[in-house]
Amino acid sequence: MITSPPNEQTGEHTGSWLGVFALALAAFIFNTTEFVPIGLLSNIGQSFDMTPAQVGLMLTIYAWVVSLMSLPMMLATRNIERRKLLMFVFGLFVVSHVISAMASSFAILLVSRVGIAFAHAVFWSVTASLAVRIAPPGKQVQALGLLATGTSLAMVLGIPLGRVLGEALGWRTTFLGIAGVAALVVFLLARALPLLPSQNSGSLRSLPILFKRPRLMAIYLLTAIVVTAHFTAYSYIEPFTQTVSRLSGEMTTILLLVFGGAGIMGSIVFSLFSDRFPNGLLITAIGTLAVCLLMLLPLSGDATMLGTLTVVWGMAIMCFGLLLQARVLSLAPDATDVAMALFSGIFNIGIGGGALLGSVVSSHLGVANVGIVGGLLALGGLGLICYTTFLFGKTQPHAEMQADAKH
């Protein structure tokens, strides 16, 4: 890791758990707002006389704006000091949420979500590398785990609480509440983060170099396939549980809580085993995800079995996301922000693609089949990781970077 001179006061020599914690809270806010519509599809649809499948397209639009803008926004902001950049990002985030809460039409709601997506594109392009950068020495994996905990808590608390608030006071109140919490997080970030001059951000010149790294390209392809598989089913978990499983609104909220809690368990598994069994854990996570999605419909009639499946599903997808994030950082240490911007963009292509595919499946085959379609895609991802593990198993990751340096 490249360090800065002491007079820059970056705080990177001793590390800062407080700074990592602040970033984890920020991650909580961003992941809450990205996925909270999943628990409010029916309510938003009622406001604008739309079906859940139609409203679900807002997830696709949001995700694809993030995917398209992640790299351009990262490059446009690559020379900006990172703490200042995060302050600007959260300012845009708060204003856009206020507009969401006041939206008089679905079109205005979509415009406000695009504003949030722009903020999201910048945030996730820099946050993982910042967490690793400011973590105490030797605690980089744990820092990523804490960041993932913030993401998981969005599933555990953010999305279910957003749903409860939306059910009780209307979905607009949920967006106002997110704006209020985000405003508080801004102050914490300002106090907790040191000055963080941009470093190792990369530039457009980094792209041809990154594209020559087969391991990295395989990770990006795997990301697109598996994330699409997951969100084909997860984007429509609310209508699935209510129309197929016949669960009440309260039980649906509990199921969302269970899924998020499982994500925290998955981040713990990642912290404990990712260093020792990186390939085995990744293959296991994808295989487990495929089984969970394929069994979603067969187990939908038994609430206990569905809850158990949800726990395993949540653990698997969290392990998968963390493993790929860590692998991208390790394969592109010379251009972390560019590599993570690409990863964030591709991840969101998967989110949007999954939401769109789930909408098509729901409209033409019925929402009951979203798990089957997602599971088949996940099996494709399992085949890809098994092949690439065999192909690159004996190749050291640094060999690719050394080859780049010779050109």
Curated annotation (Swiss-Prot):
GO terms for cellular component: plasma membrane. InterPro entries: MFS, MFS_dom, MFS_Efflux_Transporters, MFS_trans_sf, Sugar_effux_transptr_put. The keyword Iron does not apply. Pfam families: MFS_1 (PF07690). It comes from the Bacteria. It is a multi-pass membrane protein. It is found in: Cell inner membrane. Keywords: Cell inner membrane, Cell membrane, Membrane, Sugar transport, Transmembrane, Transmembrane helix, Transport. GO terms for molecular function: carbohydrate transmembrane transporter activity. The keyword Glycoprotein does not apply. The chain crosses the membrane at residues 18-38, 55-75, 88-108, 114-134, 141-161, 175-195, 217-237, 253-273, 280-300, 304-324, 338-358, 365-385. Involved in the efflux of sugars. The physiological role may be the reduction of the intracellular concentration of toxic sugars or sugar metabolites. Belongs to the major facilitator superfamily. SotB (TC 2.A.1.2) family. This is Probable sugar efflux transporter. It comes from Pseudomonas syringae pv. tomato (strain ATCC BAA-871 / DC3000).
